[in-house]
Amino acid sequence: MISNFDCTDNQASSKVLRPPGGGSSDIFGSEMPQTPRNVKNRMASNIFAAEKDNGVKNNGDAPRRGQKTVDSHSRLFGEPTRPITPGKNHMKSSIPFGQNTEAVAAQKLLTTNGHYNGKSGSVSSASSSVSSSTENLKMNSGSRSVFRNMSKPARAETPIPPADDALSIDNSCRDSEVGDVPADNRTVTKSDQVNEGCQTRRDSGNNPEQPYSLNKMAGVSNVKEPLGLCPNEIKEERQACAKLDSRNPITGLGLNGDGVGGLKPKKLRIREGNPVTGEGYKANDFTQRQESSNGGTPVINKNRIPPGGFSSGLW
């Protein structure tokens, strides 16, 4: 026997869907999470060492899991606590005076490992300062002596007499002073100066009998060139065709009424008056009637102004 029982299920049905965006969505008034999101800071630089802060995660500064910590600063720029190199003594001269050059260079390479900055220690720095001061005194005294020698006036060198077999070009040059010019020798003539009036030339190499000077030149020769062209180069002038000049193939003017070779001549119509209003025309142009018999029935032809006048494009 079948009986119906009313059963109420207080449990939530599994068919209830979650709201869009999840249960923590802001549309349903839920509380915002208090923990910050884990967002990777991609703009952070990982060149320098990362700060050891457990509260900051995924910022790109800490190395990944399973990797060794790499100090990028020491790899790129060296150790931050490296020893400071002392400054180089620029006043110390590197030119040895009174010492064996090879021995000094070998000793310097052995003591400084190939590098020398002028200061190797307290004792060496004191000795180097003393040696540099003595070397500077030597250099200064030498430079002063050179300057004194240069400032002294140069002595006139006595010319060495040339050998007998020496050429004139090999002899040393000697400046000779020229004294005052005497009063009777004021007018100086050039050695190459000649009188232009005495210069002569010939017309041709075959005629030595006709020399002439620049002051007395021969007249212009009477030989004249022909003004026109030679007869063999004269071209006959072409006679223009009379038909081409006496007609116009477009308007028909000048065809003498034959109409050959072009359009027929167009008769010019001369009208004196207004074609629209009819003023200026003769009276018989509008009232002229031509009676013609067409089967016994008279036909009246009237010369009237067309619609729009004679200036219309239809006529």
From Swiss-Prot:
The modification Phosphothreonine is found at T35, T81, T85. GO terms for cellular component: cytosol; microtubule; microtubule associated complex; nucleus; spindle. It comes from the Eukaryota. Residues 1-37, 51-89, 116-166, 272-315 are annotated as: Disordered. Residues 120-133 have a biased composition (Low complexity). Keywords: Cytoplasm, Cytoskeleton, Microtubule, Nucleus, Phosphoprotein. GO terms for biological process: positive regulation of microtubule polymerization. Pfam families: JUPITER. This is Microtubule-associated protein Jupiter.
